[in-house]
Every structure is written in structure tokens, then in C-alpha cells.
């Protein structure tokens, strides 16, 4: 079957089986086209909780599907591609952070939403890249342990100078691989383009940007800006999606190194097979994990 034929079958099956399809912004455009909701990980989780469907199919990575299950425990949640993990989320586990917490007993543990459900159970509050600065500023405690992304943590620390923020060595290996030379080369090729980067990039790269923000922030900025050319410093698919949505502007990926293999592991065929009962994986979390992990997400909503 060609792409359009598979898409037609998917649309038919999701209606028959009462499935809401969620697709992260880093997914291929052909997957976004069959999704009920698209966006970043937290937005998709909220969308899932509001959807009337009994079944949720996540086209993204495992921690995103887990977050959907935490926010919608009464629903059946599937991950379209079981091997789609997240290198950042897998860097730190509950055992490690439990030991670190003993070293910093008076610190509030702030966890990027890109963490496992198990790790969320021992954290005080979750944040997204778009809400991190606001939430950290709103915390009563001056002492913060920010996990797992040290680059995002560094960005937050610079925006929150009154806070004492402790960082651990972790983060997104894809965003972290971008260097100053990559930015210089991109600007040489496109001297009139604005540089928009994600705060998961290194501090040196962030310092060279015209705008720093979350995936949704980058997309909104580019759409609303009067500028006509943009260098996009996040997963390469965002430049592709923006080019599709704004054909009167030009978008350039900062570097071809910005390709997330985990996000790219999900295909239309995976979605089709999952809906057919021949693929995917149901996300199962025990009641205690859901209850404990939900606390830091609820705190994020309260402070954000």
C-alpha cells in the first residue's frame, strides 16, 4: 500500500476502535496528518485526558505514553513503536536520584517531563521546556536539584539568578551534539536568517541564538515573525513542518546531526499494525506508581 492508502486504513480503524491518535511534533509529516492531536509531550498528555475516546495511541516515545497513562489511568494507552525510548529519560533512574536526594536533603527536586514514570514518583515537581523558568521562579525553596538535562537546567539557572540550582550531568545527546561551529556554518550559508534554538542545546549555542524556546515556542515565534528566513536548532522535522505550514518563508535545519532516531523509529505501518492488533505495546503502570508520579505533574499544573 502507498502512504495515502495506509492513512485511509488508519483513519477507518481508529474510528471503528474508538482510538485517539497523538503525534509528537518530531514525528514525520505523514503521521501528523492522521493524528487527532499534535504538539509537545505535555500538551499531548492533556489532550489525551480531555479526549472522549477510551483508547489512546501515542506516536512518540515511551515516557510520553507513560505520562498519558498517569493523567488518564482509566484509558488504555498504547505506544505505536515499543522500541521508541528516550536517551535522556533513560539516563537517570529512581535508585540514582534517591541517592542524590540524600546528599541534598533540603533541595526541591525539579524533573523535566522527559523522565520515566518511575523517576517521577520521587520528584517534587515536573516542568516542560516552556514552563521551567516560570515554575522554578514560583517555588518557595531557593535550593533546586534540576534533572536530568543540564543544558536546560543551565538556561533556567541563568533566568532565575535568585535560585541555587544544582545540576547533574545529563541531557539530550541529539541537541547537545550541536556546537558553535555548526551555528557559524549555518549563519554563513544563510546570513539573513534568524537562529532559533531549543534550550536543550549547550549554553554556547544558546548564547548565539536570536530566540530560545521550546518546540512549540520556536514554531509560534517563526510563524508570527516578520522575518522570512530561519535556522532551526531543534529536531530536523520542525524545520520541515514549518516549511510546509509557512511556504512563504524559508526554514533551514541548523545541522543534519539534529535527527532523533527514537522519534524516527515510528512509521505509518507501525500505527496501522498497532490499530490492527499486530504491533505496538499497551502501557501498564501499577496504581501506586500512577498515584505517586501524578503528584509532581499536578504540582506542575498548579505552579505553571
Residue ranges, per PLM feature:
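Active-site loop-to-helix "anion-binding N-cap" substructures in soluble metabolic enzymes
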Residues: 1-232, 238-304
Amino acid at each position: 500500500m502507498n502512504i495515502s492508502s495506509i492513512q485511509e486504513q488508519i483513519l477507518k480503524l481508529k474510528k471503528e476502535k474508538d482510538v485517539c491518535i497523538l503525534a509528537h511534533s518530531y514525528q514525520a509529516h505523514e503521521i501528523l496528518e492522521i493524528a487527532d492531536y499534535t504538539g509537545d509531550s505535555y500538551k499531548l498528555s492533556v489532550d489525551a485526558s480531555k479526549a472522549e475516546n477510551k483508547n489512546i495511541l501515542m506516536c512518540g516515545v515511551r515516557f510520553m505514553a507513560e505520562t498519558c497513562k498517569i493523567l488518564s489511568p482509566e484509558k488504555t494507552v498504547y505506544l505505536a513503536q515499543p522500541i521508541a525510548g528516550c536517551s535522556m529519560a533513560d539516563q537517570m533512574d529512581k535508585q540514582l536520584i534517591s541517592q542524590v536526594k540524600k546528599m541534598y536533603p533540603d533541595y526541591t527536586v525539579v524533573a523535566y517531563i522527559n523522565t520515566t514514570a518511575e523517576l517521577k514518583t520521587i520528584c517534587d515537581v515536573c516542568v516542560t521546556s516552556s514552563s521551567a523558568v516560570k515554575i522554578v521562579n514560583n517555588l518557595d525553596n531557593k535550593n533546586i536539584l534540576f534533572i536530568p538535562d543540564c543544558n536546560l537546567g543551565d538556561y533556567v539557572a541563568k533566568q532565575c539568578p535568585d535560585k541555587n540550582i544544582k545540576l547533574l550531568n545529563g541531557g539530550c545527546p541529539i541537541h547537545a551534539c550541536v556546537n558553535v561551529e555548526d551555528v557559524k556554518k549555518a549563519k554563513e550559508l544563510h546570513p539573513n536568517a534568524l537562529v532559533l534554538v531549543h534550550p536543550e542545546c549547550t549554553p554556547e549555542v544558546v548564547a548565539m541564538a536570536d530566540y530560545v524556546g521550546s518546540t512549540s515556542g520556536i514554531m509560534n515565534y517563526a510563524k508570527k515573525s516578520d522575518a522570512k528566513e530561519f535556522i532551526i536548532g531543534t529536531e530536523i522535522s520542525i524545520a520541515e513542518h514549518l516549511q510546509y505550514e509557512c511556504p512563504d518563508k524559508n526554514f533551514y535545519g541548523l545541522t543534519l546531526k539534529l535527527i532523533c532516531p527514537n522519534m524516527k523509529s515510528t512509521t505509518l505501518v507501525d500505527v496501522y499494525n498497532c490499530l490492527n492488533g499486530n504491533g505496538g505495546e499497551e502501557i501498564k503502570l501499577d496504581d501506586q506508581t500512577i498515584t505517586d508520579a501524578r503528584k509532581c505533574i499536578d504540582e506542575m499544573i498548579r505552579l505553571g
